[in-house]
């Protein structure tokens, strides 16, 4: 009998917590709510450079129900994408202790009539500890940070795109 009462109390407590969380507006990050006219998109990247952001952005767009294909109504053009690395701090022997990584992306969104509706420059930055004795580990960490920055930038682009008001015909 006591065991049944404990389970019932736990169920009531769990239900109350869920209600409180939903009442305050909390929700898990899920797919973006995209207006129907925005669900078709042409994605263009600079021809001369191999974009590291493009495959990440394409996967994210498609995962959120946006068909990425040539000739679609809206156009998202990555104008430029620049990665950089600089020394952030130096140690006592003038050795590099930290590097600062950054990725800067400039993009534009055009409506089906070719009118610009959104143009932004986004920046993602990370700093990491560098150890010259562990070069391979530092290189792997740098590569992982660039991947995280690409994901961050792709999410920002998606949020900005999802908040657009569709053009009225």
PLM feature spans:
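C-terminal motif of bacterial Sec signal peptides marking the signal peptidase cleavage site
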Residues: 20-23
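Bacterial signal peptide processing site
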Residues: 25-28
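Sec/Tat-exported extracytoplasmic proteins
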Residues: 61-65, 109-113, 132, 156-165
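Bacterial N-terminal signal peptides that target proteins for export
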Residues: 2-13
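N-terminal segment of the mature soluble domain
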Residues: 36-81
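C-terminal/domain-edge helix-coil "capping" segments
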Residues: 136-169
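Hydrophobic ligand-binding cavity/cleft-lining segments
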Residues: 32-33
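Surface-exposed short loop/turn segments
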Residues: 74-121, 127-143
């Amino acid at each position: 009998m006591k065991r049944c009462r404990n389970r019932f109390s736990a169920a009531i407590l769990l239900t109350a917590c869920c209600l409180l969380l939903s009442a305050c507006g909390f929700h898990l990050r899920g797919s973006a709510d995209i207006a129907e006219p925005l669900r078709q998109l042409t994605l263009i990247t600079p021809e001369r450079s191999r974009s590291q952001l493009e495959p990440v952005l394409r996967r994210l767009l498609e995962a959120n129900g946006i068909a990425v294909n040539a000739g679609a109504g809206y156009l998202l053009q990555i104008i430029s994408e620049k990665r950089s690395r600089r020394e952030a701090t130096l140690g006592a022997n003038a050795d590099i202790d930290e590097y600062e990584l950054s990725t800067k992306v400039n993009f534009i969104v055009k409506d089906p009539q070719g009118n610009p509706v959104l143009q932004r420059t986004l920046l993602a930055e990370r700093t990491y500890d560098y150890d010259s004795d562990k070069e391979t580990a530092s290189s792997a960490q740098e590569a992982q940070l660039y991947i995280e920055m690409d994901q961050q930038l792709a999410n920002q682009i998606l949020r900005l795109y999802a908040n657009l008001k569709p053009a009225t015909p």
